Amino acid sequence: MNDWHRIFTQNVLVPPHPQRARQPWKESTAFQCVLKWLDGPVIRQGVLEVLSEVECHLRVSFFDVTYRHFFGRTWKTTVKPTKRPPSRIVFNEPLYFHTSLNHPHIVAVVEVVAEGKKRDGSLQTLSCGFGILRIFSNQPDSPISASQDKRLRLYHGTPRALLHPLLQDPAEQNRHMTLIENCSLQYTLKPHPALEPAFHLLPENLLVSGLQQIPGLLPAHGESGDALRKPRLQKPITGHLDDLFFTLYPSLEKFEEELLELHVQDHFQEGCGPLDGGALEILERRLRVGVHNGLGFVQRPQVVVLVPEMDVALTRSASFSRKVVSSSKTSSGSQALVLRSRLRLPEMVGHPAFAVIFQLEYVFSSPAGVDGNAASVTSLSNLACMHMVRWAVWNPLLEADSGRVTLPLQGGIQPNPSHCLVYKVPSASMSSEEVKQVESGTLRFQFSLGSEEHLDAPTEPVSGPKVERRPSRKPPTSPSSPPAPVPRVLAAPQNSPVGPGLSISQLAASPRSPTQHCLARPTSQLPHGSQASPAQAQEFPLEAGISHLEADLSQTSLVLETSIAEQLQELPFTPLHAPIVVGTQTRSSAGQPSRASMVLLQSSGFPEILDANKQPAEAVSATEPVTFNPQKEESDCLQSNEMVLQFLAFSRVAQDCRGTSWPKTVYFTFQFYRFPPATTPRLQLVQLDEAGQPSSGALTHILVPVSRDGTFDAGSPGFQLRYMVGPGFLKPGERRCFARYLAVQTLQIDVWDGDSLLLIGSAAVQMKHLLRQGRPAVQASHELEVVATEYEQDNMVVSGDMLGFGRVKPIGVHSVVKGRLHLTLANVGHPCEQKVRGCSTLPPSRSRVISNDGASRFSGGSLLTTGSSRRKHVVQAQKLADVDSELAAMLLTHARQGKGPQDVSRESDATRRRKLERMRSVRLQEAGGDLGRRGTSVLAQQSVRTQHLRDLQVIAAYRERTKAESIASLLSLAITTEHTLHATLGVAEFFEFVLKNPHNTQHTVTVEIDNPELSVIVDSQEWRDFKGAAGLHTPVEEDMFHLRGSLAPQLYLRPHETAHVPFKFQSFSAGQLAMVQASPGLSNEKGMDAVSPWKSSAVPTKHAKVLFRASGGKPIAVLCLTVELQPHVVDQVFRFYHPELSFLKKAIRLPPWHTFPGAPVGMLGEDPPVHVRCSDPNVICETQNVGPGEPRDIFLKVASGPSPEIKDFFVIIYSDRWLATPTQTWQVYLHSLQRVDVSCVAGQLTRLSLVLRGTQTVRKVRAFTSHPQELKTDPKGVFVLPPRGVQDLHVGVRPLRAGSRFVHLNLVDVDCHQLVASWLVCLCCRQPLISKAFEIMLAAGEGKGVNKRITYTNPYPSRRTFHLHSDHPELLRFREDSFQVGGGETYTIGLQFAPSQRVGEEEILIYINDHEDKNEEAFCVKVIYQ
């Protein structure tokens, strides 16, 4: 509730001039105004001399030139410091508003305000000038549409000068206005239609900043924080209210009697003549209910009719209107006003500033005139008037989803959302003795959020009580009749529009105008056809539904009812695209190398891995099961683990026989544990002489490091790197986590082509064999399948893949084995030093309780030093410029007083002048032998002595002035505690601070934090769970903190009481951690230094400060946190290739929850809740449950950048409600590529050209493609790309198969091995018409192949040349790739079928193309391998 009151009180608007409110209403127009910078010496020199620390800001207000009236609310920019001399002041602040007063005389006044401190320390604010910003042109219906920069001229004086009667429009041409020379404000003003969907959240004529948080709008994406540039509405929540009871004390009868008596007295005192109190009657008791966001009503409030509690059963037979004075016949004993119907509020939003406003109104009327005679219906309508008597506000966020609520009613002169006078609250001046001693009344109701069922709802219909008219009253007017008279309204009109079927008060009653005070005074008639107050139309363009409509609804009332569209209810989410199942892209099989491969590896001369005793490490089999004993790992005497990764060989598989080129060089990327992501150097693939033809499991190529000149190193082959994981790296208690990481996690390795920079594939290896289990060293050799994964487009894999409600099978993901990686992993144990071992045995719980007992305290000494205690009593002279530069500069001001403040020497000048003075005195002393110079020396010494006396006086005055500040800053060290946290991405670091009240009096301590990533744990259950996970046994207190909305939490401390304040630090930002990737810090086999994660200075460090302020505002404790961010564990890596400057939408399906590492055994029942967070705020990442018992999907929506940008971010998944420890951490890479769409025919050549744009320097480049058999480029080899030039790259595409798929094309700098450009060629290929079909049976297995022949007849009368192609070049070869045949002649085509290793069927297409490579015919050969 505090949020609503705060926003409501801070955004009170001054309404436009009443004459503007009477004009016809027009549609509101939205604008965006960007105040860029201020040029020129706006701030006078005299102001800069009088004030210190001068700052500047702008103020913007609306002004009506016609009526000389300021309205709306003054908006202020952020304060910017000024420089001497004044130069350009940059603001760059966006300003938004919308208004329907599109008249040229409606302008915005921009005022330049300077503020600074006077000599006595008080703050002084001065107006330095103003400008008139014209919003609309001379044509009222045409706003300024130019969006280019404009300059606003500034005038001397303040905007209050516009109120002077001598200033006539145009004010800019008035002789009393004086321009400020060479001063202007740069700005842009343009319409902003994107703000129209948020009009209901922003009142008209309200100036708001794009950086301001608007209740009902989602925060902006990115770092700009401008939520109004593209507003995004929050999801609404439907609320229902039932059984509303208004209780007015001491009773409803007494309350209404006194209300009528006071109305009669007020009527007589205002000089309107006597009025019989018995003749005044209550027509209706109405309730207005609306949703308010602190700025204004979101929709026009609903209007319903209340009835006395005792009259509920009589409303169908008795008349509703009655005379209050006859209490014996009506409401005797009635204690409450009741609403029988249900209220539906579909515009609620889950925001602390959204509240429901209840307004209780009474409609009065007198059936007799002033002279006592019967009045006509017209006079009755004129005498009707409505008054608000009570109101209440309720914030649903503070309650549960359903329940009963009791609210106190408010009244009196305090501000309310309708900005009108309210009947006063009970006071001592009341005439009734019972009213004096009771409250203002209460409101009780039952509520439910997001539910359509009634809560204890009555059996009557939802519609309100039917109103029966008296026979003497005239029926309501028809829609064609002129509207009833409506009094003038200045602020927040509440009258409902006239329509058929409404009650009599709906036709005649309206809110009382502040300019009319007499109840019986008739208002002036509105002319026929004119509209009511336009302010009500501009604030509420649609009338809310009214519950007291009669049964005979006419067409107008039906339009009223249907104009308020109900909010559509969201159905359970069902994905239409195929999600990626976690694990499918890294399902490479791993095994142990064969004995033949081991012979080749051993004979190649790879370095041997030795333990600490220089003995070979124990070799374990990668296929043997591993028994993990955590106690055995922790009790190991070798506390340090040296992790060794040896990349040995990369072999080609026999299945990869499509004619694709084999890479010459490769490099690997991966991330091990919390170490920075690693990228190995380029390694040469050297073919073994003994390898021969590739077969299943055969070793073909070994890895050799490449030197700088491009040749491979003749030394030992392979590449080796080491990671040292010891007590110096691991945090206290982290060793068990590292052992569990080795036991359950897999290491994913990406293999890249070192020349084309294309991804070859990925491999995954389990690390459980690295657990030493008490052994000195272990090593395991692995043979890993390198798998390439391709993701099809979502629109290609939709149909036919739905398995049930919310289920999609993992289609659209194709994997191909590209090769086999031979890798050796080893773990070598080392003993650690004794001092390091001592710090590693610190219990984890000790570091989670921070006490200020050991804080440094001031121990005396100079105030100019750092205050640190010295063990040795040694006083060493220091340079004054080093100790206090300000004092050193002051000591030299006497010599330059006449040159102005701009010539004050700097620190270096002060030091240099002092040295010159000392040198001069030394030379004068050396010349003491000369009698003539001796007198000069004496005069110089006297001058120096006089100068020293002056310096001492300046020093004494300066020390006296800064003594209080220096003492206070040094004494604050006594209450300051410093602590260092080692945080990881997504992990909540929990700790407690022991706070003690050092005073003899109780205090309410406010906890102020300057870092949003650090927060106080205010939920006791969350505190309890964190303590249980950390193993702390300190007490937990319920309701420890007093929460005040968005303000800082408070807690109460008794004298000398100690309390444990719980904190948690959690960071989801990984922006600077990406810098660590540039310096992996790897070491090869020749440099055996282990990798240390702290060698790189790119590891970011954050700081947070917590201030504990007592009741008087003085701090009693200060906690300074230094947060050292550490690299984190990555469980899964995803790589997506997507067209540039578009959105990637992907769904990643989670496997069953019990299969995740670390899940409890037997957890097969209800899955825990899944929460997801992303390190990039510009990425939309969410999770939804598809249905009961269905799997969960993680949805990503990422905007790709320009090509060839690579965007990486982390997705963090939690399974606990407090988001304490991530269950999974994924790293997602998005490669932005230039998209090229190609529609072609299989087997036929399609040509296109790509434009290459040169960079700043000359580059030698080459084009590489992922499918060289299907896509060829011209130039084919290396060519020169001129600087800043344009060159064409010719591309020929011949797809071998029909279908849709992606082909990657990279342009690489061959000298620097950098990616210059990259394209994503999207092929949409159709199959040609098959003219002939053949069938052949072949034997599977080893063989020489089979030769066959088919004939082809030239259908043309002339001689033609034809070219032959096949969609399976590895299975079918032609005797001749092209042939010539005469017109009408027949040619025999020779075919050679290669043997196949597996049994099955294969359809091979033969494409016969003409001389232009267009398809003439296509044959299909069905091969059956037996």
Swiss-Prot record:
One of its GO terms (molecular function) is structural molecule activity. Residues 503-536 have a biased composition (Polar residues). Changing R1192W: In NPHP4; also found in a patient with cardiac laterality defects. Residues 474-486 have a biased composition (Pro residues). It is linked to Nephronophthisis 4: An autosomal recessive inherited disease resulting in end-stage renal disease at age ranging between 6 and 35 years. It is a progressive tubulo-interstitial kidney disorder characterized by polydipsia, polyuria, anemia and growth retardation. The most prominent histological features are modifications of the tubules with thickening of the basement membrane, interstitial fibrosis and, in the advanced stages, medullary cysts. Ciliary dysfunction leads to a broad spectrum of disorders, collectively termed ciliopathies. Overlapping clinical features include retinal degeneration, renal cystic disease, skeletal abnormalities, fibrosis of various organ, and a complex range of anatomical and functional defects of the central and peripheral nervous system. The ciliopathy range of diseases includes Meckel-Gruber syndrome, Bardet-Biedl syndrome, Joubert syndrome, nephronophtisis, Senior-Loken syndrome, and Jeune asphyxiating thoracic dystrophy among others. Involved in the organization of apical junctions; the function is proposed to implicate a NPHP1-4-8 module. Does not seem to be strictly required for ciliogenesis. Required for building functional cilia. Involved in the organization of the subapical actin network in multiciliated epithelial cells. Seems to recruit INT to basal bodies of motile cilia which subsequently interacts with actin-modifying proteins such as DAAM1. This is Nephrocystin-4.
